[in-house]
């Protein structure tokens, strides 16, 4: 078999890939079989260090023949024609998650809405208040005293908005911090009033 168009896959040097998605094992001296994953993407399975490792073809191709810096990179590989089975090099584009999300949203006939994140100025969906990167993360620094203050003086809903957790998440956080039933705070309210 001629291997003139094949290139080494950097993360798996015992395997080679052609621009057409053929994967060759130098261990077994044969081409690997493509399989179809549950998401509809073709993949191959390598045997490395006693384990099976499955990797989708479009990421392997982008890694070796395009500008995907590594297989673990957070960059995504887009199929221009949206056909998951078309992994020809001219159909693959490496892009950021945000760019991929916007492209897919527009291709599906939805509008982005022209809204921008107030923190970083990235374009966001019309129903979003911030982009995913700027969305407030739950703070492990929330104390039981803070929760009690907001709930006693206002409500669970107001407390959850102020502290950046869902109402239910805040109740679970209170229980994990104190071991008490979150309803016990309401009992304090009735005792105070």
From Swiss-Prot:
The entry's keywords: DNA-binding, Early protein, Endonuclease, Hydrolase, Nuclease
Leading EC class: hydrolase
EC number(s) stated in the UniProt entry for this protein: 3.1.21.-
A molecular function (GO) term: DNA binding
Induction, per UniProt: Expressed in the early phase of the viral replicative cycle.
InterPro entries: His-Me_finger_sf, HNH_nuc, NUMOD4
Cysteines engaged in disulfide bonds, as pairs: none
Known function: Endonuclease that cleaves only one strand of asymmetric DNA substrates thereby introducing interruptions into the template or coding strand.
Protein name per UniProt: H-N-H endonuclease F-TflII
Species, as recorded: Escherichia phage T5 (Enterobacteria phage T5)
